[in-house]
């Protein structure tokens, strides 16, 4: 009997506490929504009646160059991150100038074709001199050309092997 009475009292306390909390939340929500409406109404009332809508400014905001210089300095603008600026500068210095000077992908394609033609002439010239892939490999190992790195020599041998397989 005592346990039942304790459970009933505990349940009543929980229910009254939860209803009190929910009513407090509802009261706060009503107060907040009323103040938000008041703020909206006061901001609308502060504007002239004829021009309630806000409009974006026109693209051209100044008449002369001097006004434009002043306007551009005074106006807040989005700043480019320093990392991005450094990256663009490095790109321009390293190899971007070559890409920026080209006008189209067709020009790059023509350049690539010219390079392929030159390399094809060089490979056919090696064949005319009597080199096979094995003899070329031995010749490079025995007397490497001046200024040629090992990676370049390996690449030349690889290209000549492919050329030999295609044309023989």
Curated annotation (Swiss-Prot):
Annotated signal sequence is: 1-20
What does the protein in this record do? Effector that enhances P.infestans colonization of Nicotiana benthamiana leaves.
Output this protein's name: RxLR effector protein PITG_12737
Q: What's in the keyword line of the UniProt record?
A: Host cytoplasm, Host nucleus, Secreted, Signal, Virulence
Where, per UniProt, does this protein localize? Secreted; Host nucleus; Host cytoplasm
Q: What's noted about domains in the record?
A: The RxLR-dEER motif acts to carry the protein into the host cell cytoplasm through binding to cell surface phosphatidylinositol-3-phosphate.
In which family does this protein belong, per the annotation? Belongs to the RxLR effector family.
Broad class of where this protein is predominantly found: secreted
**Short motif RxLR-dEER, span:** 54-77
UniProt key word Secreted: yes
A cellular component term, taken from the record's GO annotations? host cell nucleus
Summarize induction of expression. Answer: Expression is induced during host plant infection.
Task: Report which superkingdom the organism of origin falls in.
Answer: Eukaryota
